[in-house]
Swiss-Prot record:
Domain remark from Swiss-Prot or TrEMBL: Ester-bound lipid substrates are bound through a crevice formed between the LRR 11 and LRR 12.
Protein name (Swiss-Prot/TrEMBL): Toll-like receptor 2
Cross-link (Glycyl lysine isopeptide (Lys-Gly) (interchain with G-Cter in ubiquitin)): 754
LRRCT domain sequence ranges: 525-579
Quaternary structure note: Interacts with LY96, TLR1 and TLR6 (via extracellular domain). TLR2 seems to exist in heterodimers with either TLR1 or TLR6 before stimulation by the ligand. The heterodimers form bigger oligomers in response to their corresponding ligands as well as further heterotypic associations with other receptors such as CD14 and/or CD36. Binds MYD88 (via TIR domain). Interacts with TICAM1. Interacts with CNPY3. Interacts with ATG16L1. Interacts with PPP1R11. Interacts with TICAM2. Interacts with TIRAP.
Residue span, TIR domain: 639-782
Provenance organism: Gorilla gorilla gorilla
């Protein structure tokens, strides 16, 4: 029994391991370039079977806890390894021994409490290393990075347990593009620990407290170009000149991000910055000022020289006691050399006139996402304010009148670039006043419905994108760039109004087509962006866009953003890939050809009808059918005549004086039906013919040249023809009054021609001795 249980347990373990292995393999996908992705796949270990084909391996956000020597042994060509946000607590000494080609290694946010230099010794090609967020207290007992001669980006430290920086920690590193140290809970800093690095382009330092800030500052000031301080409480910071000593500063930019500061500590920070002789740029992002702007120096403090600072950037500054804020008059003297100022999303509603007048060197001012209105802007742009200002950005404020805004800026004589986008102007007056040197104007997202002469003629760049424009007809003779995307325009602007245009961006409008002639009319155009419109892919448009090879050089978003909207069967397809059928592309020619063919068919039908009497056939058929459809007055009708005589009026003498006399005076007499005598007056002649033929036992045709030429004889012959065809009888008797060729009888009377070919007909003899026999034969034929 125990043996059986043991076997069951072993089998269960094997099955469990096989399932886990198959699950690991299923969570990893690799492409043909060796890029393998297995992030967020619930992996418990590094998948087996990895080969030298793998070049990039992403296993972030899994449950991996252990890396063995064999896991990555075959990945000799691996260049990037991402293992962030797992549960890794152990890495065997030689786990990375075969990764000589590795350039990018991310081990951040795991559970590595001890770091080993043996991990990194084989990584001679490493340029990026991230060890942030692991619970180590120090960076190991020996130097970790001394063998990483190609390292450019290094990130180390954590928020809670990293408490000590030692001199050996960064030994061997001479140049770094970026060094990020999370020393939020730093308690000990060994002097000159960071001084060993000769040059750092960008140092990011996370520190909750400022206790060790000056010591670190002394070490990095001569090697760091951009120093960024994050998440630091400087409310009680105090600068001591003795702590810095003589320094040869290399710092050009100092950034404070998510830093707390007071009026007094800001003054102390400025004293610190005064030690950086080459400082050019100062930036405050997401900072909190716990003060009211009272930056007055104490009697013991000397006046601060701002040095060479040219750029000041403030973004999302939070001032809890905003309503008590001062006028900044104590800082006026420090601003005269500043050339670029950005104060963004910081609730600025006014720049005092005196401050504006002190900003004598200011060339660029960005007050985006604030509370500026025309009345306060007028005070800010007072006489002699911002005398050197060239660019003013007032994006997303509370401006509402273009006319007032333009008039307010007239005092700025050197102003050339104005961005007042994302304000709500809605309408535009017919005329406005602007500074004389205006070259650039941004009116995007201002809800305007039309553009007028308010736009200055001196502009070289105009942005009116994302509005409600359906027409652009301004004459701007100097305009070089026009941005008018996301409007409602249905066609390209008139090129004659924009003779100098180089760049036109008109994507996502209501344009359905444009032609070669339109583009050629823009003589100087170099760049056109017209994608995202609802193009009608007509044959002309397709021919133009697909045959012009040079068009791709002008259309910067070709071909991806040029899609057909119609015809419906090509909707959504790229214009360059659409091919229309011949019938769609040559519809006019096709319709014309069909009309010509139809005309020729009708003409041919007419000729054939005329040649073969088709019209006559139809007329006779119609008359016969009409006659057949007439209701009978009696269910049956008796034969009233022995024969109906059809003859030509020119043969009337022979019929009336010879034939009638011989037949009607015979004993017993024959009763003949003659049209002159027996037709009912007032009745339709066709009806008379049909009725007479139907009431007659026989129909006698007196054939002669006159008969063939007679129209009424033709009718009588016609209806006799129909009767022969309809009733299939032999009621017709043919008399040849004079010799006549069978060809003289119209071919349309095929039945009668057949009778003449198959049956004997009577011929009027010229010899009087034979005429008695003729009458005997005729009487016999009528009686038969």
């Amino acid at each position: 029994m125990p043996h059986t249980l043991w076997m069951v347990w072993v089998l269960g373990v094997i099955i469990s391991l096989s399932k886990e292995e198959s699950s690991n393999q299923a969570s990893l996908s690799c492409d043909r370039n060796g890029i393998c992705k297995g992030s967020s796949g619930s992996l418990n270990s590094i998948p087996s079977g990895l080969t030298e084909a793998v070049k990039s391996l992403d296993l972030s956000n899994n449950r991996i806890t252990y890396i063995s020597n064999s896991d990555l042994q075959r990945c000799v060509n691996l260049q990037a390894l991402v293992l962030t946000s797992n549960g890794i607590n152990t890495i065997e000494e030689d786990s990375f021994s075969s990764l000589g080609s590795l350039e990018h290694l991310d081990l951040s946010y795991n559970y590595l409490s001890n770091l080993s230099s043996s991990w990194f010794k084989p990584l001679s090609s490493l340029t990026f290393l991230n060890l942030l967020g692991n619970p180590y207290k120090t960076l190991g007992e020996t130097s970790l990075f001394s063998h990483l001669t190609k390292l450019q980006i290094l990130r180390v430290g954590n928020m809670d347990t990293f408490t000590k920086i030692q001199r050996k920690d960064f030994a061997g590193l001479t140049f770094l593009e970026e060094l990020e140290i999370d020393a939020s809970d730093l308690q000990s800093y060994e002097p000159k620990s960071l001084k060993s690095i000769q040059n750092v382009s960008h140092l990011i330092l996370h520190m909750k407290q400022h206790i060790l800030l000056l010591e670190i500052f002394v070490d990095v000031t001569s090697s760091v170009e951009c120093l960024e301080l994050r998440d630091t409480d400087l409310d009680t910071f105090h600068f001591s000149e003795l702590s810095t000593g003589e320094t040869n500063s290399l710092i050009k930019k100092f950034t404070f991000r998510n830093v707390k500061i007071t009026d007094e500590s800001l003054f102390q920070v400025m004293k610190l910055l005064n030690q950086i002789s080459g400082l050019l740029e100062l930036e405050f992002d997401d900072c909190t000022l716990n003060g009211v702007g009272n930056f007055r120096a104490s009697d013991n403090d000397r006046v601060i020289d701002p040095g060479k600072v040219e750029t000041l950037t403030i973004r999302r500054l939070h001032i809890p006691r905003f309503y008590l804020f001062y006028d900044l008059s104590t800082l006026y003297s420090l601003t005269e050399r500043v050339k670029r100022i950005t104060v963004e999303n910081s609730k600025v509603f006014l720049v005092p006139c005196l401050l504006s007048q002190h900003l004598k060197s200011l060339e660029y001012l960005d007050l985006s996402e604030n509370l500026m209105v025309e009345e306060y802007l007028k005070n800010s742009a007072c006489e002699d304010a911002w005398p050197s200002l060239q660019t003013l950005i007032l994006r997303q404020n509370h401006l509402a009148s273009l006319e007032k805004t333009g008039e307010t800026l007239l005092t700025l004589k050197n102003l050339t670039n104005v961005d007042i986008s994302k304000n709500s102007f809605h309408s535009m007056p017919e005329t406005c006043q602007w500074p004389e040197k205006m070259k650039y104007l941004n009116l995007s997202s201002t809800r305007i419905h039309s553009v007028t002469g308010c736009i200055p003629k001196t502009l070289e760049i105009l942005d009116v994108s994302n509005n409600n424009l359906n027409l652009f007809s301004l004459n701007l003779p100097q305009l070089k760039e026009l941005y008018i995307s996301r409007n409602k325009l249905m066609t390209l602007p008139d090129a004659s109004l924009l003779p100098m245009l180089l760049v036109l961006k008109i994507s996502r409008n209501a344009i359905t087509t444009f032609s070669k002639e339109q583009l050629d009319s823009f003589h100087t155009l170099k760049t056109l962006e017209a994608g995202g419109n609802n193009f009608i892919c007509s044959c002309e448009f397709l021919s133009f866009t697909q045959e012009q090879q040079a068009l791709a050089k002008v259309l910067i978003d070709w071909p991806a953003n040029y899609l057909c909207d119609s015809p419906s069967h090509v909707r959504g397809q790229q214009v360059q890939d659409v091919r229309l059928s011949v019938s769609e592309c040559h519809r006019t020619a096709l319709v014309s050809g069909m009309c010509c063919a139809l005309f020729l068919l009708i003409l041919l039908t007419g000729v054939l009808c005329h040649r073969f009497h088709g019209l006559w056939y139809m007329k006779m058929m119609w008359a016969w059918l009409q006659a057949k459809r007439k209701p009978r007055k009696a269910p049956s009708r008796n034969i009233c005549y022995d024969a109906f005589v059809s003859y030509s009026e020119r043969d009337a003498y022979w019929v009336e004086n010879l034939m009638v006399q011989e037949l009607e005076n015979f004993n017993p007499p024959f009763k003949l039906c003659l049209h002159k005598r027996d037709f009912i007056p007032g009745k339709w002649i066709i009806d008379n013919i049909i009725d007479s033929i139907e009431k007659s036992h026989k129909t006698v045709f007196v054939l002669s040249e006159n008969f063939v030429k007679s129209e009424w004889c033709k009718y009588e012959l016609d209806f006799s023809h129909f009767r022969l065809f309809d009733e299939n009888n032999d009621a017709a008797i043919l008399i040849l009054l004079e010799p006549i060729e069978k060809k003289a009888i119209p071919q349309r009377f095929c039945k009668l021609r057949k009778i003449m070919n198959t049956k004997t007909y009577l011929e009027w003899p010229m010899d009087e001795a034979q005429r008695e026999g003729f009458w005997v034969n005729l009487r016999a034929a009528i009686k038969s």
